[in-house]
């Protein structure tokens, strides 16, 4: 207990004597404060007649009224709420401030039944006074129990209350509250999400007390580690879109979403003011949306594989979190540069409209409802197209495949990234959520919501290979071989060298992601722990009755709950989904398999996986179908292979099994490879530093490789070092011959015939995929050195000191990584028809040259960029679509050129596409073809 003398001193500070140096005249600080209040409440223009706003304000008022009724208002109270007694426990104190913030919102939000209630305001202020004396003051330790509450959580709530009730708080009271915040959070010095929270605490407080120096410090704090600058290690956003927090955990949808929200709000607050953000690295924030969030949002849900321990929070299930991220995108759209603002609005509109499971408006603030409805109701804003992509997140050991109608997330770990996080009594059963886990999303939008995590069998997470019924400890792995390769941003291969030391379990696991199928392979599965080893094919939440139809090899299986079966000779399985269409799943087992299955009702509580005080302990029950392959006890060199076929009917799965589009090329502990015959794709993961071959691909080092052969005319190849530990090169040989090629920097082509040979310099590449494209041709000449002078090639880059002429103002950027060289030019989507960039090569000989362009692609680009090729016979105009195909060379035809600098390629910014978009000028390549 505080002494009487100390209490008296605190009360004197609160009520008497010292007068704060706070100006009361209307000024820029007042405008910023009112802007923040509007962000919190929606402002005076809020339309209470809108049904979604009314529902939100009604709930706000109901929650506030419930809290108010339960308050202890007595003069002798020893707590504010009995359920949150314990005035030194930071968890409880933080929760008290959060409740008071809700009450302050209800008292200041138009349409709330408690709007303007003077008694409510007075009781809130009395509670703040009591808390100052008993719980939150400068005599407290800054880090007791949980530092986050004292230094970040409580100050954020108190700042908001101070803004909302600003006109009701005396100068003395205000100064006391603000001084306390300054005691706990005087400056900004952390990383990632914690830094963003520090910045918002310091910044909003600075607005309240009118401190220009602190407000500038808050703004500048965004330029520090883990926010604006891309990370190259540790916490923060990476150039590939990854987000890491606590050094080794994938957290895009957890701490990353907090960075996004907090950064967006602070940038919005300061936009248009004296303290507007001017750091050029703020442009990285726009890229977060395209690279980090767009691929990981599925019809309103944020993928759980990047939410860390937050998946164990009952109030933060995937759609609620996804809605919060979309709210941040809506916020960014209010002040981002015009082309980004337009793109953000399109993305937000699509996600809001696609989520038929959970209303976006039910999870966001009244101000966000107001802003989002202005977007959704605007017929001139077209929703963005659904993502159709494959993306490798090398910096956080994740991969995602998105197709119209389904998506698959893959969560891995390594020596760099940990398997799962479980701290602060959260995520107690997260054991296998990042250990080769597959997350399949389809039209069953409730699959990972509605109590999935407290009821799913945590020992049997889909995709994993485990020692039956045993947990694993959190931490990084013992192997660096985790990662994969992306081909053309559409297809990919991933793998993980798995090792659970506690169970002497090792395995090599690969996933090959094509168009509408995902192939999973496992090899070298061995253990000496005396425990059955199994690979989990799926663990799918069923409908409320648990009677989803399913078949094996076309024969109906029992749908009764509590039924366990051993199915032998299984070639294919079909499981009906939970919706009328778009949620069925097929499973194909090449060569047949023995499958263990169990259909059961599972009961659990959120409290069992999250033991924090406010977590509900009510039992919930859900039904599941689990399928796994039993490798037996102490297996040695066991293997498996299966194919996931999302959204296929039983007839379609049966037809696929009869004539599969895939072929397993090899599945050993040395190399795993699959061919997709209809697409001309071959993927291969090479596990050792020995020369090995899979189909047409030979590699001398550990590597992930994918190729695509198109109509016997072109061969595309992508290569990565998934170990991120090779400080040299990977030598690749492809059993084809070629006549010409284009390749990323870092690739050296040494031979085109009779086979293609090239090396990839992966030193410092951090798992990046390197791309090359080969023009196929007959082997008629024996070994061909592509560097011979009779086949010269010349590249002119926008950054070259000679050979590049600009007309009009072009901006230089380097934010996108699918570029050639250090940077590229863009027209700022302005001055259409008045700008151009001309690339003039110095060609060593006259003759025919195939001309290629490279550009960093984005869906806000022009889709019909006008290109003039000046050649020996005149000028030819063509057009390219810069919305896709980034980072690779695109042929625009073959032309005759004279030797020297008489030829040219001019990229124009004429506005001929629909809609108009950015035009970029990056690099041009001239390759002699005869």
UniProtKB/Swiss-Prot annotation:
GO process annotations (BP): polysaccharide metabolic process
Pfam families found in the cross-reference section: Golvesin_C (PF25275), Lyase_8 (PF02278), Lyase_8_C (PF02884), Lyase_8_N (PF08124)
Reaction(s) catalysed by this chain's protein: Eliminative cleavage of the terminal beta-D-mannosyl-(1->4)-beta-D-glucuronosyl linkage of the side-chain of the polysaccharide xanthan, leaving a 4-deoxy-alpha-L-threo-hex-4-enuronosyl group at the terminus of the side-chain
EC number(s) per entry: 4.2.2.12
Biophysicochemical property: pH dependence: Optimum pH is 5.5 (in the presence of sodium acetate). Active between pH 6.5 and 9.
Keyword Transcription: no
MF term (GO), any: calcium ion binding
Chief location category: secreted
Something else known: The 99 kDa precursor is converted to a mature form (77 kDa) through the removal of a C-terminal (22 kDa) fragment without any loss in activity.
Name this polypeptide is given: Xanthan lyase
Gene: xly
